[in-house]
Amino acid sequence: MSSTAHPTNLAPSGNGSAACVHCHRRKVRCDARLVGLPCSNCRSAGKTDCQIHEKKKKLAVRSILDPVPIRCRPPNPEEAPKPISSLSPSSEPPNAFTTALRAVQSDITAPSGVANRVAHIRSRSSQYDTKGTRSNNNSGNNTQYQNVLPEPDSPPYSRPAASDPSEGESRADIEKRLVNLIDGEASDSRAIQRGVRAIYVGHELSNMSFLIRQQRDTGDDVYHFAGNEIPRRQLRTGHDQLLMDALTLPEPALADELVHAYFAQVNPGYPIVEEELFMSQYRNRDPADAPPILLLQTILLVGAHVTRPKSERDTLKDIFFRRAKWLFDNRIERNRDILVQAALLLTWHSDLADDDVSANAHYWIGIAARIATGLGMHRNPVCSRFVPRDRRMWRRLWYILVQFDVMVSLSYGRPQALNLEDSDVSPLTFSDFEGCGARVQADFVIHFSELCTMISYIVRERFGLRISAERRKAALLEADEALANWSLRLPDRLRLRASDMDPWSAMLHLTYNNFLILLHRPHPRASAYSDDYGPHDAEICSAAAGVIASIFEELRIHDRLKQVWYSGVHTLFTAMIQVRVELRFSNPVLAINALRRFDSASYSLRELAQYWSHASTILRLFEESRRLQEDLRTTTSDRPRRFSNLSNNSTNSPASQQKNTSGIPHLANINSSDATPPSAPSIPPLQPSSQLSYEVPTTESAHHNPRSQPTLSAHTHTYTTQPFDTWIPSNNLTPMDTVDNSREMLDWRQLFSFTDLEGPVLPSTMEGITELEDEWRQIYWQETPMSDLLQDGGWMHG
């Protein structure tokens, strides 16, 4: 029996439509609201279980462009933690970041809610279009950066507890991996089995590759060694908590401090972010025009690197990195320009030293390079219909990416991610820095871009795998002359100075002198390229190492090591290898002077280890290797010396010299104690015909600049397609049979330009230069100061 009475529990629908479960399933029109239950269709079908279909309740979702306001966790009366601020620094780990998002706590235990929110976030278009310009449909962006009072009944989100003590032991083992590799007796015979991490020591320019290849003069090209076991990590943060954690911001006072620190200490030299645009968005607190959350999290990370003490720095950087990486990996930000900016800023995060391939700066530069070339940043945007602001930003980002790519390539001896032969981006000009703030270092960025571009071409011509021996030898001559011309043309504010060196000119000369050592130090195998060197390699490497050690000492004294980027650690590593060779000189004066440099460099490396985790592994290498310590003791002992007349005058001074914590002499006294210095010869002025045109080879410059197309002789016509030649004047492309004579004409002191040329700041000529040069090479080739610690592996190709 069926009832035709209208049910009393059927409320009229807002749109006048409702369906029973059967009609909803069949997707047919239902008249249950009009005739009651059962509906006409169910009565005709004889179904008695006719019921109104109830729609499932939709979870409240919010876009990343329309988040809820951020609030603080209610204070715990038992713990009463102190907030982190610039006014009240705390040595305890920061806990001001345990904030939560209001109105989403009900979804914490429901992973599907998070999935729905993420799907909705991805479906929403970004507030920026693909060119970085503002779109018009962003009125719903209600992002706020002030904290609001929490609801009393809402459960807060708290970070996981601190890690277990075993992680500290694992970190110590990771930092000692280089020591274990060095002191191990059979590191080259260990099989790379499953579960064991392979170590690629790099190629040619890598310091670890250079050290490992010294011991035996064999032909086996081994580049991979067995490392430690692959560590196992557990995810301490649940997947359902990652989204709300990534959208969390710190207290306004701390956020303001970190943002200001970034734009005051980092962005002037690496203008990745347009300061005026970002700060206007950040200060206005306009919900319709808020700064991108991904970019803000990465800026907070870099700001924490340069401001907070170590007790807070590591924790803060881990928090900001976790949030930024989640936002990056889940493609929350749809503007690809911001992805390039974020990837470059994430290079300031120092992950654990157990992985320098899929983490740290090398990894993020590779990602930034892929995105940038995918966007077409490597092509000249002049003729494109770009907004001028975006055109300037693209050029800046491209050349900063070139800088980072070259520096990381020199650090690890790995191929560069960018090939400048495929780029025709016009050189930077001062107009490209409009909107970057009054503190921007335009001179530094322009000249540093020139240096890194030149290094990129030199590395390919000097160290390329398929470069002929003749071309390789000629490239050394051309590189020296190009570098000397570039150095002599630096403006006075960027030249080397004896004291008070700003961090930007310091970074410029650290990279420059690091490359001089890599370019001129001998090959670790005596039989390979034994004639491929110049007559002044020892002086150049020694002077460059002294400059590097002095710059780091100057930065350490003025508390500016925090502004040194990732590659600075490897630059100091290069200098310490050279200084360690000098520790074995038979001349005691030179050995003691090298000991001063080594002590100063060790102090700087210890300070850098406070900021960069990979510096700790190098520090352990020099501090805990038993064989390295034995060589250091030998330097201060009364061992037989070749120069007996100098030995008697200096054997009673090493102990007192070693206690001197002032480190090495300043730049004004480089090598002044090596021997009786004659008057430094004056630098001959460059002739107008030999001036370099430091213009990046582009399609425009090839047609409009006749000097960029050198006239080659018959002996060098096969190299006309090499892009490096466009950086070298035509008279530098000397025929192969006159390379040695031409090299003698270049004064090696031209490679070192100082501000005050009237003082004794240039490296002076050392006594017995011929004997010193021979001894220097013999130490590299025969005594091998570090090869007795390391196993062989094939440092270079065949």
UniProtKB/Swiss-Prot annotation:
Gene3D superfamilies in UniProt: Zn(2)-C6 fungal-type DNA-binding domain (4.10.240.10)
GO MF terms held by the record: DNA binding; DNA-binding transcription factor activity, RNA polymerase II-specific; zinc ion binding
UniProt xrefs under Pfam families: Fungal_trans, Zn_clus
Compositionally biased region (Pro residues): 678-687
Bias (Basic and acidic residues): 632-641
Polar residues bias (residue ranges): 644-663
Principal localisation: nucleus
SMART domains cross-referenced by the UniProt entry: Fungal_trans, GAL4
Any one GO CC term of the record: nucleus
Stated name of the protein: Acetamidase regulatory protein
The species this protein was found in: Emericella nidulans (strain FGSC A4 / ATCC 38163 / CBS 112.46 / NRRL 194 / M139)
GN (gene name): amdR
